[in-house]
């Protein structure tokens, strides 16, 4: 009897969902995608990586990434440093790890006095920097494997939600002694959908 009641209840729920499936799916999609900005990295070879960004965890890093991406700063740049089992790094306008946007932003991690709860797990995106804590600019890296030893030292600010196979493919390419791919891994574009939310510009140092 209880089993039949459960089945009947399920059918009623399914019927209700079916009547409003279009509206419900749209609502779920809007809820799922509007909570965080969504970044789309499109590679020259057609590969696509999608990431959600976390402005509550690292607001300056997220503002900076959105500003650079949507101003087409990253278009045509490469992943210049690739270490399989560790990370892939891009965002340098010089293509060799020495370039940036002409300014720096605050390093949002605990060693620099900023609470950041996002651990450097596989798929997490974080800001690359030089030795100085507040030296991040445009360069970023995506963890190819769990790298929690970076926690507290680098500003993690988002995570891959689609396209880890593309990250894996980039991480698997042959590199030279400086970890630069022998064949350029070109970023065609990076764009961030903020779903109408204005995040503003980062504080530039």
Locate each region found by the language model:
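Cyclophilin-like peptidyl-prolyl cis-trans isomerases
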Residues: 8-9, 13, 18-205
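Positively charged n-region of N-terminal signal peptides that target proteins for export
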Residues: 1-4
């Amino acid at each position: 009897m209880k089993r039949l009641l459960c089945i009947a209840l399920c059918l009623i729920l399914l019927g209700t969902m079916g009547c409003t499936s279009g509206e419900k799916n749209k609502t779920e999609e809007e809820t799922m995608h509007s909570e965080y900005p969504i970044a789309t990295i499109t590679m020259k070879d057609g590969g696509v990586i999608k990431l959600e960004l976390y402005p509550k965890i690292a607001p300056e890093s997220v503002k900076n990434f959105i500003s650079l991406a949507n101003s087409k700063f990253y278009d045509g740049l490469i992943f210049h440093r690739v270490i399989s089992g560790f990370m892939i790094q891009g965002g340098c306008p010089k293509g060799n790890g020495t370039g940036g946007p002409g300014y720096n932003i605050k390093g949002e991690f605990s060693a620099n006095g900023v609470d950041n709860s996002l651990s450097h797990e596989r798929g997490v995106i974080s800001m690359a920097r030089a030795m100085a804590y507040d030296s991040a600019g445009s360069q970023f890296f995506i963890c190819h494997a769990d790298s929690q030893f970076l926690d507290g030292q680098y500003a993690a600010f988002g995570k891959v939600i689609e396209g880890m196979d593309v990250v894996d493919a980039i991480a698997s390419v042959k590199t030279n002694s400086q970890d630069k791919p022998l064949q350029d891994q070109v970023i065609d574009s990076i764009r961030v959908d903020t779903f109408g939310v204005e995040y503003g510009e980062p504080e530039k140092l």
